[in-house]
Amino acid sequence: MKNQFAILLLAVVFLQLISQSDAIWSAIWSGIKGLLGKRGLKNADRLDELFDGDISDADLDFLRELMR
């Protein structure tokens, strides 16, 4: 009975190891594909599109209304 329990425990541990390593390898592979792909190299810095340095008068008026 102890032998069967030890085999079951080892099987569960190995299955967990395989399933977690599959997730890690797929994440690494998608990262490599993202870096080496055409779009991955062009869109390396996505934060530049989010920042707009110019603040218009309408934006300032809207912010003033929010702060009231």
Curated annotation (Swiss-Prot):
Compartment annotation: Secreted; Target cell membrane
Signal sequence range: 1-23
GO BP: any one term: defense response to bacterium
Residues the record lists as Leucine amide modifications: L36
Tissue: Expressed by the venom gland.
UniProt keywords, alphabetically: Amidation, Antibiotic, Antimicrobial, Cleavage on pair of basic residues, Cytolysis, Hemolysis, Membrane, Secreted, Signal, Target cell membrane, Target membrane, Transmembrane
Keyword match Membrane: yes
Domain of life from the UniProt record: Eukaryota
Function, in words: Antimicrobial peptide that inhibits the growth of Gram-positive (S.aureus, MIC=1 uM) and Gram-negative bacteria (E.coli, MIC=15 uM and P.aeruginosa, MIC=2 uM). It also shows 37% of hemolysis when 15 uM are tested (93% at 50 uM).
Similarity annotation: Belongs to the non-disulfide-bridged peptide (NDBP) superfamily. Short antimicrobial peptide (group 4) family.
Protein name in UniProt: Antimicrobial peptide UyCT5
Source organism phylogeny: Eukaryota, Metazoa, Ecdysozoa, Arthropoda, Chelicerata
